[in-house]
């Protein structure tokens, strides 16, 4: 039963990623399944689900996206640990953990994008906002965060 749940969470991640790519949405929806798996089954399963998405997507569509699996792994670990410690049992904890995960994801994504893709985000909305911010005079690194 657990294995079916994990596979379902991987498909939730894959569906979110494909939906965003198809409709060119300004969102990253490839970690919903990671969060659900980490919350229900713990940090190890959350990390496995997060890594599985990026590995499978990389093998099927674009191997360059595999590096972002590190972010999904971190999301799974953070959510899983916070759920086990009870931080997600009350609103302030949920908001605090959400803020931390968002900050970590944006920071790590920026570092990985610069390290491997010269800052390109492969999302039309995100690249447009970054270009606009650079055009009006924002620092290049700050505009990507």
Which stretches of residues belong to each language-model region?
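Alpha-helical transmembrane segments of multipass membrane proteins
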Residues: 9-16, 49, 53, 57, ...
């Amino acid at each position: 039963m657990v294995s079916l749940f994990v596979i379902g969470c991987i498909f939730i991640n894959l569906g979110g990623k494909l939906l965003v790519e198809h409709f060119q949405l300004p969102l990253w929806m490839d970690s919903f399944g990671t969060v659900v798996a980490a919350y229900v089954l713990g940090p190890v399963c959350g990390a496995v689900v997060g890594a599985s998405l990026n590995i499978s997507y990389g093998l099927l569509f674009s191997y360059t996206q595999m590096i972002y699996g590190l972010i999904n792994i971190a999301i799974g670990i953070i959510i899983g640990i916070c759920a086990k410690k009870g931080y997600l049992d009350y609103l302030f904890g949920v908001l605090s953990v959400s803020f931390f995960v968002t900050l970590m994801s944006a920071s790590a994504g920026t570092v990985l994008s610069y390290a491997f893709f010269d800052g390109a985000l492969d999302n039309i909305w995100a690249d447009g906002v970054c270009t606009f911010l650079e055009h009006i005079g924002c620092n290049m690194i700050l505009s990507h965060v």
